[in-house]
């Protein structure tokens, strides 16, 4: 017996949770066909039938993408993970990634065009119909570039250990031929209005290749010339390409954000769009574009002459189990968190209600809401319970489950009614394919009325490295839209596995600590939504913010401390306390009047370094340190803090700083002679 067979109001609801899913192997009303057919979610099995050679990108796509985009999204995750690892290499030329590492990600399987077609499908979600000619245009661009970059890498690998005149000439000549071609191709994609939005994920990948190539020139161009007996000149030197690289970082970052926002607006203003459509575009673009441009600043050799330990602290959402009968704005408010400090799940309380109909013989226990407990970064002592989410009544029962940091949740399965995706009976939480715990409503409904859906952002493995996401929060919509009270929309949010709980300060790399990884901020300070290109949200600093970092035990090292920030405030002073008290004056970084955080461009951010180093301290026992950044209470201007960076005073940094000072002095002397 179907305990809901008389509730005809439900028939207007769609069961599939993904607005873009093309799978239709099961009837919308399965009870009318084969009531005993098992209904394990088969979306990914469908994708395997559609995507050729998809297995190299992972075997568990869950409910987060469609067959038309999964290969492209997977490639994007791998590229970002690869770059995070490469930037952390503690060598002088950190951030120079071999094209032999980057390019094979995009050319795999029997039809390498799959990746580029999927990237177009991601970018084209806001558009009703994509010009089919675009894929031909795109492949005609990327294939020759790939061939030339392969050749360039071959020449570079031959030159590096044997820096002869001939080897230097070969790599130098190919660079000067290839670089303007890539620049011209990117301009063509940007300047064609019909190409901009659909090609954005592909554009971001090609732009990454261009920045990587320019980083080669910024580092090695003078050496190539010297190997050939040529003296560097104003427009023919490593210094020139360093400046050119910095301009391109800004150009590509701003273009990607502007184009992404244009696509997001198109979906949001489309009256036929659902929240899942909106969220799918946001999720896929985050994984293929926004995560990428968030680490573009690391290519700047002036700011990052050595390795950089970077993190992505943004939070992304898998699609909700039902998004009908509410607007995008309503569901955005009901399912996503307001900007907050970075949190780590500690416990979860799950609520259950018996919605038994007196005419039915079943106890229809189902999920009705949740409450999450969490800690902040490097703080296991203070457990904070958040708000209760869902429409809870006094008759509801609840049970608390622990979450373990050494067993991060990377997949959630929802067991729900086979027809109605928002009637939930169980949630099963997994870590590395093993069940950690299971919430159950203990409903007596028969199993043939149940269906299981998976929610995850699949892990990707590349060159023996694994890149993934872990569950960061659960939120149930408070809105009740039916006389039957057990229907619930629930959303899962995820964060990148690059995030370090302890804020460990690296010995040999520059360590970036996002402002959102603070323990707390003063009551007059505020967390605000970021502009999209910083890898997370921002802190408006007024009085103070506290954060805890971890230094390695029994090791002594001095550090310079630097802040990445944005403000139109006149000169203000900030203080940093911890080992010692140091201060620095913050110049304004933008002349714009009271800019909103979401509107901040790349150029609106600046850096300031404290003039005194954090002195040597050897930690023999307790290796964590509480530090506080003080601003100006009740300041009328906003100071947006993005990151606090710790720069180790190593010989590599000292050598690079001395080299930069010599080059700046030489430029001043040259300018004097010219004038």
Curated annotation (Swiss-Prot):
Biological process annotations from GO: sporulation resulting in formation of a cellular spore; symbiont-mediated killing of host cell
Residues of the signal peptide: none
Gene Ontology molecular function: signaling receptor binding; toxin activity
Record CDD domains: delta_endotoxin_C (cd04085)
Keyword Cytoplasm applies: no
Pfam family, one: Endotoxin_M
Record-linked InterPro entries: Galactose-bd-like_sf, Pest_crys_dom-III, Pest_crys_dom_I, Pest_crys_N_sf, Pest_cryst_cen_dom_sf, Pest_cryst_dom_II
Gene3D superfamilies: Galactose-binding domain-like (2.60.120.260), Pesticidal crystal protein, central domain (2.100.10.10), Pesticidal crystal protein, N-terminal domain (1.20.190.10)
Keywords noted in UniProt: Sporulation, Toxin, Virulence
Other facts: Toxic segment of the protein is located in the N-terminus.
Known function: Promotes colloidosmotic lysis by binding to the midgut epithelial cells of mosquitos. Active on Aedes aegypti.
Sequence similarity: Belongs to the delta endotoxin family.
Protein name per its UniProtKB record: Pesticidal crystal protein Cry10Aa
Gene this chain is encoded by: cry10Aa
């Amino acid at each position: 017996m179907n305990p809901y067979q008389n509730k005809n109001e439900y028939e207007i609801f769609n069961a599939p949770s993904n607005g873009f899913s093309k799978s239709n192997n099961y009837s919308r009303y399965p009870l009318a066909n084969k009531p005993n057919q098992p209904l394990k979610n088969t979306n990914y099995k469908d994708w395997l039938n559609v995507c050729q050679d998809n297995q190299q990108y992972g075997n568990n796509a869950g409910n987060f993408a469609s067959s038309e985009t999964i290969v492209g999204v997977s490639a994007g995750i791998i590229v970002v993970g690869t770059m995070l690892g490469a930037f952390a290499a503690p060598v002088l030329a950190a951030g120079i990634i071999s094209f032999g590492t980057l390019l094979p990600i995009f050319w795999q399987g029997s039809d390498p065009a799959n990746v580029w077609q999927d990237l177009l499908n991601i970018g084209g979600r806001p558009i009703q119909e994509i010009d089919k000619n675009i894929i031909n245009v795109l492949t005609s661009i990327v294939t020759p570039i790939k061939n030339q970059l392969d050749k360039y890498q071959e020449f570079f690998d031959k030159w590096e250990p044997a820096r002869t005149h001939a080897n230097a000439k070969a790599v130098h000549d190919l660079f000067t031929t290839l670089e303007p071609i890539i620049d011209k191709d990117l301009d063509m994609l940007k300047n064609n209005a019909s190409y901009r939005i659909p090609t954005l994920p592909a554009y971001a990948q090609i732009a990454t290749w261009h920045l990587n190539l320019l980083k080669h020139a910024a580092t090695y161009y003078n050496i190539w010339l010297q190997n050939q007996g040529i003296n560097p000149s104003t427009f023919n030197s490593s210094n020139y390409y360093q400046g050119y690289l910095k301009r391109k970082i800004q150009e590509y970052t701003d273009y990607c954000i502007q184009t992404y926002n244009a696509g997001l607006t198109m979906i949001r203003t489309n009256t036929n769009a659902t929240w899942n459509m909106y969220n799918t575009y946001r999720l896929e673009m985050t994984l293929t574009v926004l995560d990428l441009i968030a680490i573009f600043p690391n290519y700047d050799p002036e700011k990052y002459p050595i390795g950089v330990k970077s993190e992505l602290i943004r939070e992304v959402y898998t699609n909700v189990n039902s998004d009908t009968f509410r607007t995008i704005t309503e569901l955005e408010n009901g399912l996503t968190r307001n900007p907050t400090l970075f949190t780590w799940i500690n416990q979860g309380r799950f609520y259950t209600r018996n919605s038994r109909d007196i005419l039915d013989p079943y106890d229809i226990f189902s999920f009705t809401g949740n409450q999450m407990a969490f800690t902040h970064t490097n703080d296991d002592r203070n457990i904070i319970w958040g708000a209760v989410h869902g429409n809870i009544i006094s008759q509801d029962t609840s049970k608390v489950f622990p979450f373990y940091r050494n067993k991060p949740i990377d997949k959630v399965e929802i067991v729900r009614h086979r027809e109605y995706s928002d009637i939930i009976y169980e949630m099963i939480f997994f870590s590395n394919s093993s069940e950690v715990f299971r919430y159950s409503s203990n409903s007596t409904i028969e199993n043939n009325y149940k269906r299981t859906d998976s929610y995850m952002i699949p892990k990707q493995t590349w060159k023996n490295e694994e890149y993934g996401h872990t569950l960061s929060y659960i939120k149930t919509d408070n809105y009740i839209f039916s006389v039957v009270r057990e229907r619930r929309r629930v959303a899962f949010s995820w964060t990148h596995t690059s995030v370090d709980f302890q804020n460990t300060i690296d010995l040999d790399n520059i360590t970036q600590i996002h402002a959102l990884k603070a323990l707390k901020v003063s009551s007059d300070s505020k967390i605000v939504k970021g502009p999209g290109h910083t890898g997370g949200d921002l802190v408006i600093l007024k009085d103070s913010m506290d954060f805890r970092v971890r230094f390695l035990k029994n090791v002594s090292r001095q550090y310079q401390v630097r802040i990445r920030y944005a403000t139109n405030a006149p000169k203000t002073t900030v203080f940093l306390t911890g080992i010692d008290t140091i201060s620095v004056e913050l110049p304004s970084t933008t002349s714009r009047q009271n800019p909103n955080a979401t509107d901040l461009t790349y150029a609106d951010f600046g850096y300031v370094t404290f003039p005194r180093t954090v002195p040597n301290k050897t930690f023999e026992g307790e290796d964590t340190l509480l530090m506080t950044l003080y601003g100006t209470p009740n300041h009328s201007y906003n100071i947006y803090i993005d990151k606090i960076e710790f720069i180790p005073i190593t010989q590599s940094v000292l050598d690079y700083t001395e080299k930069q000072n010599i080059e700046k002095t030489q430029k001043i002397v040259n300018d004097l002679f010219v004038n």
